[in-house]
Amino acid sequence: MLSRVRVLAAWALVCVASWAVAERILLIPLDSRPAAGHFAQMIGRMASVEVTLPPIEHLGRFTDPGNPERIIEWLRDEDYSDVLAVIVSTDMVAFGGLIESRVDSVPYETAAYRMKRVGFIRQRHPQVPFYAFSAIMRIQPTATLANASWRMQLSKYVELQDRYRRTQRSEYAQSMRNLLARVPPVELNRYERTRARNHSLQLHLLQMVKDSLFDYVILGQDDAQPYGPHIPDQEALRRRIAQLGVASRVYICEGIDQHSNVLVSRALLRAHDWMPRVRVAFSDDAGRRKIASYESKNVELSLQDQLLASGARPVFRDGDHDYSLFLNVPDPRDPLFEGFLQVLIQDIEQGFPIAVADINLAKNGTGDPRLFQALWENHRMQRMLSYAGWNTAGNTMGTAIPAANVYLLARKIGVDPLQRELALREFILHRFVNDFAYHSFTRPKAYELIDSMSRASREETYGAEFERVNTLVQVDLAGYLDRYFREQFLGQKFFAGTEQYEITSLNDVRIELPWPRAYEVRLQFRIGTSSVSQLEPANRASGIPPSQSGRARYLPSP
C-alpha cells in the first residue's frame, strides 16, 4: 500500500518550467497499414514528437510492394538537425514490405545492398541513434486467392517437420507425406528459398549491430506457434547473437506489427534516460504460463519481452512502480476475472495510473466484452493511460505499453500539456473504436457483404465490389465512432497545465480500408476543445485543480 501512495505522491510533485522543443523520429514502417505507422505517430504526438514517415505512395499496398529505392533516398535526404532517432523496418528497406518479405522476388544480394546503403546513411549521422526491426518469417504464406488451395497444407507440413525433428514420431512422417502431395513442389521450393534468404539477411543485420550501424534491433516473430521452422531459425539467431556479443542490443520478441510503437517508446525513453517501472496485474495467474494464439512463448515471457524492448521494466510484486498494467489473459477463470475487474475499477476510480491490455482475444482478434463494458461505465475509458486489444497478444501488449510509457514520459519532460492530453484521449478513443467496435461489429458486416458477392473474397476484393465494402465500413464505423465519442468524451472536462478544457467536437474524420480486404481499417480524427477556466493562483504551483487541492491524484496535469 505504501508503494501505491508513493506513486500518487509522485504525480502531485510533477511540475515543469518550460515545454520541450519539438523533435522528430524518422520511421520507415513495415508497410502502409495504419498499425504499422499511424499508431506510432499517435503515440509520439503525446510527447510532442513528430513521427515522420516516407510518402505513402512509396509504401506499397498489400501484394504491390513498396519502393525501397525511393524510401532509402528519402531517408538520405531528410534534414537531421531535429531528428531524435531513426527506426527502420528492414523488411520494407530490403524487400518492399512485410508481404513482399514472404516471397522470393528480391534476391539476397539486392536486399543486402539496400541494407548497406542504410548503413552508409547512419555513418553520415553518427550522433543519431538508429533502431531496426525485422520479421522472423511466419509459418503460413500471406492469404491470397492464388494460394488458397495449398497454403494451409504447406503451413501444416512445415509445422510437422519441426515436430518430427524433435520427436522422431512415425505418425508425423506419414502425415507429412500426405500433406506434401497437396502442395505444389514449386511453391514449397519458393517458400524454403524465401526463409533461407530472410534468415541470411538477419544474420547480416546482426553483423551490422556488431559494427555499430544499428544501436538496437528487435527480431519480431511474425504469427507463430510452439512448433515450426521459425524455432530452429530462432535457435540459430540466438547462437549468432551470443557469438557476436550483441545480446544487450538485440531482442527477440513475439509479433511484428507493433514494433514501430515499441521502438518509438524505447527511443524516447533512452533519449531522456528514464526507465518506467511497471506493476503487472493478471486476470488469472494461471494465464501467465499459457501460450497465446499465434505465439511461441508463454504470456509472461512474451510480456517481459515487450516491456524490456519498449524501455520499461516489470515489477511483478507491489514494489515501487510508475504505473500498473492490467493484463486480461486468455480464458481467465470467472471468479478470478471478477476479482481482477473489481481491483481495476477501484484503481481507476481512485485515480491511479492504469494501462489495460486485453489479450483474452476471440478467434477474430476482438477483446473481452466484459472488460469493455466495465471500462465503458462511468466514463472510465478516458481515465486510463492506455488500452489495447487487437489481433494477437504481442500486438496488444506492444501497443498498450508504449503508449503508457510515452504519456508518462511526456509529463516528466515538459511538453505542450494540451497536445499531450488531447493525444492521450485521441489514442484511447481510437483504440476502443478501432480495436473493439471495428472487429466486433463492422468487420463481420463487411465479411457478410463480401460473402454475398460472387466476385469478392475475404482474402482480397477489388473494383466495384471493393467500393461497396469500403462504403459499408465508412458508414457503419462512423456510427460507432460518433456514439463512443458522444457517450464517453463529449462534454468531459480535463486539466492541461493550469488550464481546464472541455471536449467539444470531433473533427477531420477519415475512415477507409487501406488494403483490398476488410481485415483492418484506417481511422483518423482529431478531438476539439474549448478553454473552461484557469486554476486559482494558490494552486498553480502544483497543477492540482481546486477540487483536488491537498489530495495526490492522477487526474491533474502538470
How should these model regions be labeled?
Residues E23-P558:
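An N-terminal assembly and electron-transfer interface module characteristic of large anaerobic redox
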